[in-house]
Design a protein with these regions (language model features):
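Hydrophobic alpha-helical transmembrane segments of membrane transport/permease proteins
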Residues: 16-66, 159-180
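Short amphipathic alpha-helical coupling elements at transmembrane boundaries
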Residues: 40, 50-53, 67-71, 89-93, ...
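An internal, D/E-rich "acidic patch" concept
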Residues: 58-114
Length: 234
């Protein structure tokens, strides 16, 4: 077990190093000079050189990569070229909205997917199964941004049940904050719910074909009883 864990950790470390190299190289080959972008095209050359020195852009690529990597390990993600503020501070500020949104979307997708997958598996080949599988196929095929636009159009612009944009902040109350996150959470949850529902249905159908389910049915259990008492536990 220890050997397996060490191999997995080594594999993870190698993957992270490769990913960091790819990200760094993509940024390096991108056109443009960060100093010129931050100061504008009319900036004086001595001002540009001073900013390049401050940002470490005059260092070699290897030095910049090592500085960037060790900085990330210490929680220093550098300075945003656009906002000229520490990236860690920007991430922290937005995390108070992004993390609850992700949890909200995960909860919604689970609440939608599990009942849909269970119902589809219990009605295999029936109208309910076909309808749910058709809906999940649409959910997988249609991108999130289209769902988001339709939700805003219907529920924010036409019905005016929700705000069309912006986040009021948690200072205005938990209900107000969650209400503002509802439409984005639904837009994120629907495609994930479609995938989870299909996985749930497929897993249940595999279990329903197992020998212990046949044994339970032979003992007199109805298909629904076998599903709820045995299949869902596994």
């Amino acid at each position: 077990m220890l050997r397996y864990s060490l191999k997995r950790l080594l594999s993870l470390a190698i993957s992270l190093i490769i990913a960091s190299l790819v990200i760094f190289l993509v940024i390096e080959v991108a056109p443009g000079d960060p100093a010129s972008f931050m100061l504008g095209i009319n900036a004086q050359e001595d001002t540009l050189n001073a900013l390049r020195e401050e940002l470490g852009l005059n260092q070699s690529k290897l030095e910049r990569y090592l500085s960037w990597t060790f900085g990330m390990l210490q929680g220093d993600f550098g300075t945003s070229y656009t906002y000229r503020t520490p990236v860690a501070d920007m991430v922290q500020d937005r995390l108070w909205v992004s993390l609850p949104l992700a949890i909200y979307a995960l909860a919604l997708s689970t609440l939608i997917a599990f009942p849909a997958g269970i119902y589809a598996a219990s009605r295999r080949g029936g109208l309910g199964d076909v309808s749910i599988m058709g809906a999940t196929q649409l959910g997988v095929a249609i991108p999130n941004f289209w769902f988001a636009m339709m939700l805003v159009l219907v529920f924010a612009i036409n019905l005016r049940w929700f705000s069309a944009g912006g986040f009021p902040g948690w200072d205005n109350g938990l209900f107000t904050g969650l209400k503002a996150l509802t439409l984005p959470a639904i837009a994120l949850a629907l495609p994930q719910a479609a995938i989870l529902a299909r996985v749930m249905r497929s897993s249940l159908l595999d279990i329903l074909n197992e020998d212990f389910i046949r044994t339970a049915r032979a003992k007199g259990l109805t298909p629904r009883q076998a599903l709820w008492r045995h299949a869902l536990r596994n």
